[in-house]
Amino acid sequence: MALTFVDDLGVHGLLPLTYTHGPQDCRVGILTLSQKWNLLWRRQEASLSVNSRLLPNDALLLAAQLLSQGKGLRQGGQDLVWHGQTDRVEWSNWDGEAEWITHPEDIFLKNGFQIRRDVNWLLEAGGEWALPAWSQRVDPDLHTAVYRPEQVYVHPSAIVRAAVLDASEGPIWIGESAEIMAGSMIKGPVAIGEHSSIKMGAKIYGDSTVGP
């Protein structure tokens, strides 16, 4: 499997975030753009070039899976995904949804929806990503108040003590070795990245990602 992320002139709109790394390393939701594509790309034998600002979605992924060598998809003059050298690609117009990060504020405006989408994709992927819901934990903290426990996903190595986890408006994802200290209040959709620490009495509101 080989995914290649290709910058276009649109990366300048993401400055200063893209001074030191590409747009594909920006985290929107739980995962970075490159993590999303690598998680979802199923054609292990095939390489794919991807616009580094492009967020994946199910329909676009399916269309990309069906592309043959030398074929590509464009929308509004912007290259989306393709196989081969761009000057030799036979392009087709993509009239479905294509979602981008164009300016730094897009990362924050799209974050809540991307948390919800990432949760679904991660659970479908299984393996190390398939975190048990709070309602399935064998050792839940009895001093933690949880609303919609089926929407709260906590890595077994994470520590949650005497907190309020409100997933009534969106999922809460707590990653590996994260710590939620006593008195913390978290209202989903929220992603707490691996090795992150939420200090005592902190309030984290929806559409937020903390760490890693």
Region annotations inferred by a language model:
Residues 1-149:
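Terminal amphipathic alpha-helical/low-complexity segments used for targeting or macromolecular assembly
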Residues 137-212:
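Structural signal for interior beta-strand "rungs" in well-ordered beta-sheet cores
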